[in-house]
């Protein structure tokens, strides 16, 4: 099961696969910052740590939107380390105005949006406990790449597995956000 989540050969990109590739490309040295939801579950499960104080998360508090401002803080608290932020589309919409702070301060946050077009964790609970009675879980998302570029932040949308390694390499090697 774990190998299918980390090394799929077909189908759409999986959250575990993306997290695993980012942690490998960062040399297992980065600070992980997560939001709330499925992205948090996958990031905490598959991100590998080699140093203490390498994870910033709100735990089970349910604070959607936590990741972006927390990642900004992590860049100030540990300026010598790479900060990788994993966030879902729902959480990013809660605090994406902080992209302005990232632009202003040139915070070198490496932002990875795991966009599944749902409030994924909420939908999962509706499947498990509410007989698949879905309520307000699909997301009508804006063009996140365009928004980031509007703030002067380099951005790239990746949906093809063949592009993933190069996109991560560019993300981690680009100075600034």
Can you describe what each PLM-predicted range is?
Residues 1-74:
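Active-site diphosphate/adenylate-binding microenvironment
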Residues 42-177:
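Thiamine diphosphate
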């Amino acid at each position: 099961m774990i190998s299918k989540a980390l090394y799929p050969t077909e189908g759409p990109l999986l959250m575990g696969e993306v997290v695993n590739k980012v942690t490998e490309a960062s040399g297992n040295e980065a600070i992980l910052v997560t939001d709330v939801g499925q992205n948090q579950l996958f990031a905490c499960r598959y991100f590998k740590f080699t140093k203490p104080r390498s994870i910033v998360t709100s735990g089970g508090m349910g604070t959607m939107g936590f990741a972006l401002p927390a990642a900004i803080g992590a860049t100030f608290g540990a300026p010598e380390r790479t900060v990788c932020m994993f966030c879902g589309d729902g959480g990013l919409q809660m605090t994406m105005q902080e992209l302005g702070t990232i632009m202003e301060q040139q915070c070198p946050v490496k932002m990875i949006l795991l966009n599944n077009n749902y409030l994924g964790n909420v939908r999962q609970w509706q499947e498990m406990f509410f007989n698949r009675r879905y309520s307000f879980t699909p997301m009508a998302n804006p063009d996140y790449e365009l928004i980031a570029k509007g703030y002067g932040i380099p951005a790239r949308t990746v949906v093809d597995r063949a592009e993933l390694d190069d996109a991560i390499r560019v993300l981690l090697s680009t100075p600034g956000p």
